């Protein structure tokens, strides 16, 4: 009888002495940033009608959970949504309403759920749609979303923007970066953040420094990023400048790709998109 009582106790002690099984790490989050180029071009191969199927194919092959777009207009957004039925999108035109360019954010509703979303303008009056400050030619803005992943309930923010393009706009790009970073500082520190965009500035400059004081360039976290470093190619296929970045807080990139492939000979846009797989940092 005594031996029978001792046996369960011994098994319990043995179980306590064994190292705890390592928890399975969460699956990575796939994010895409894509300047889709407005439908303004009339030359064959650059026209929206000529390249829209290539753009859909590029997104479908990447299959991101979330995607920040730049230069998107509603005509393009509606077409993409019709061809990508698992995706939903949101965003407001930079002048307010549905007109003009959007910083549209797309998300796979089977992978993530949208909990909150909003917009703010990079100006002295960020809550005023279409507001312009600091000498910008056009309204500049951010569209953001708070997402919850369906499989495990993990939450994250995505912020998406497009900064001014002229060489002399660097001070205005810095002001925009500072405004975005100030906004990020108001968010809960335990919820990871991704910032996607066409920043119209290259790494190493003042705009990059303003961002990377609070965020990390995902490309720098990967030992061997795939594809070219530069992203803007003006429909030549040979990129000359690295204008598009993915910046993170609370994530570490495991894979980073600049997608330079043509689809049936067609370039989807004048920018190469970025596709990044992000691991969640341990809390």
Sequence positions of predicted segments:
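Active-site-proximal beta-strand elements of phosphoester/diester hydrolases
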Residues: 28-41, 115-120, 144, 155-164
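His/acidic metal-ligating clusters that form di-metal
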Residues: 141-161, 170-199, 207-211
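N-terminal, active-site-proximal structural segment of metallo-dependent hydrolase catalytic domains
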Residues: 22-83, 94-101, 178, 279-283
